[in-house]
Amino acid sequence: MSVLPDRQVINQIISGHYADPFSVLGMHQTERGLQVCALLPDAQEVWLIDTKTGRRVAQLDCEDPRGFFAVQLTRRKNPFRYQFAVTWQESTQIIEDPYRFGTLLQDIDTWLLAEGTHLRPYERLGAHLMSLDEVPGVSFAVWAPNAQRVSVVGEFNFWDGRRHPMRLRRENGIWELFLPGVQAGQLYKFEIIDCHGQVRLKADPYAFKAQMRPETASLISPLPDVVENTPARQKANDLRSPISIYEVHLGSWRRHTDNNFWLSYGELADQLVEYVKYMGFTHVELLPINEHPFDGSWGYQPLGLYAPTRRFGTPQDFKDFVAKFHEAGINVILDWVPGHFPSDEHGLSTFDGTALYEYADPREGYHQDWNTLIYNYGRNEVRNYLAGNAFYWMERFGIDALRIDAVASMIYRDYSRAEGQWVPNYYGGRENLEAIAFLRYTNHTIGVERPGGVTMAEESTDFPGVTLPPDAGGLGFNYKWNMGWMHDTLNYMQCDPVHRKYHHNLMTFGMLYAYTENFILPISHDEVVHGKRSVLDRMPGDAWQKFANLRAYYGFMWAHPGKKLLFMGCEFAQGREWNFDTSLDWHLLDDENGWHKGVQRWVRDLNHCYQQYAPLYELDYQPAGFEWLVVDDHENSVFAFLRRDADGNELIVISNFTPVPRYNYRVGVPQSGHYREVLNSDSAFYRGSNMGNQGGIHSHPVSSHNHAHSLLLTLPPLSTIYLTRGG
């Protein structure tokens, strides 16, 4: 008979309540020789095999009918590699013992993970296919410092939490285990006995692949290979480059017409890439594609931050999808949500029985607007989980930029909270200092480790220095959405033209702060939902005027300083609000001479013109790149300005936001010569009235608007025209 561990310990191991399984299971040196213990429920017979010789060394005694086996080897003193020959009810199987392997995390990883500065935590935590001591399998690691016991459960062990309890690394609260023989594609979860003794089944926070709702398990999947960061893609994100973004929700851009089912990543790669290229957009921005349990969140309530959603295919399919865009010369932006997460039981909520990933105080940790939980940015491990995820998408999938959602909700503790419902910071202020530090760290890390990779903030307040570097007191973003400009200009466009003269400043106010941040001008998904109506439907007037207003507005927007963003469907003036559960109304484009086709052509030509003429983008963030020519003609609702590039080349832009044509309208210009009409939103090609300046016009030596020369123009009704000197 062997010398058994304490009976209470055996009972705890069998019941799945023993926190230190490696101290009992496996091979151990004792005063009487080697002792080997194993927990193999349902096994009928277990033999110990010397791996080197392949010979059976000894039979393990069944010390408990619930599956606890042990043997004492009095003649052997030194540990050796071994296996078990296990006889089940109908077969005999040679298996490796997970409890013969040593620790997995290296000291440097332990230090960096605890400090919260591990650049690639996803290389150590989660599930990783590997070979250990020449044995193929999977290493598992999960952070749950307050758990009483953590086990890996899955298809490979009948989802039985007794079979594979993990080792706790007390120095950092990480549980780890190497499971031989486990393969890619198998389902798994972590079974946690939390600090209160309650059993919880949790998906892997670092899983690279996950089941689609309503299922909730993680899937073992290889870590994606690194994607090369090319100079061309880096340059395309530069402040002096043209950036025109097509914002897309993959689940509703287009669907199968026969069953309204989603297109796959592969089908989207074939259709969406070609369309974006044809339309002249330089970038595509994807609403969140992280795995998420609720379709109606549009992806903005993710649980599987490291797993591309299975709705459209596999992680490799998504990676190929991104590569297809890159082959077409289009950069890919991913909407990223580090501000909150849903409270689904299988997710991060009370992960080990405590508020581990979220703030414990609901005044800090509960988001009232979305019924979600807020990450605890004060914890090193949480910051590392999020910052590592940002780098993961860039390094492993080739994502070129991240657009960070709801930044204001992160950096203000009183965001959407009444008096008494929020907790001040250490200094008594309303700023979330931990979130600010997290954003600065993440942005700085991306800037250093992924040159050319950029971040874009959806930040709706006037928080100063969003796009300033952290060492200058800023948050370190590269770009910021200009929500104020969007609201002001849309409010202006909604006015009846006869009343626009009273709101003239709405179109000019944006230039007063245009150089305080690196702005993107966004017409996003948020502007075509929740009863706001479509952008087209906001335009006043009859059908002709609605479409003319929209074309004129887009022309003004594309010429205004700031990079551009347009949500899908807006490029062809979809008439209804966006519905995430069905395709865009592509049938509106069936009429080649229709209104919607005209708007689509206009946006396409705007994009190609935008890329062709450097004055429209090169000096977006420098005062030298813009000059008002006509800023105060509120009576006629006319605006005129010029854009200039670094070489002094200029492009003139004039908008008439009334349905009244303006004849012989004089606009001062810096230089004499012939000015060619590059674009005219009133062209018949775009379904306008075809009024204009016969393709071009010569300047006159008549001073106007503080310039010695001027143009005598015909301004079509509800129009924007572009003019360039020469040609």
From Swiss-Prot:
**CDD domains reported for this sequence:** AmyAc_Glg_BE, E_set_GBE_prok_N
This entry's Enzyme Commission designation comes to 2.4.1.18
Point out the signal peptide segment: none
This protein's pathway reads: Glycan biosynthesis; glycogen biosynthesis
- GO terms under cellular component: cytosol
Task of the protein = Catalyzes the formation of the alpha-1,6-glucosidic linkages in glycogen by scission of a 1,4-alpha-linked oligosaccharide from growing alpha-1,4-glucan chains and the subsequent attachment of the oligosaccharide to the alpha-1,6 position.
Q: How does it assemble?
A: Monomer.
Q: Protein name, please?
A: 1,4-alpha-glucan branching enzyme GlgB
Protein species of origin: Yersinia enterocolitica serotype O:8 / biotype 1B (strain NCTC 13174 / 8081)
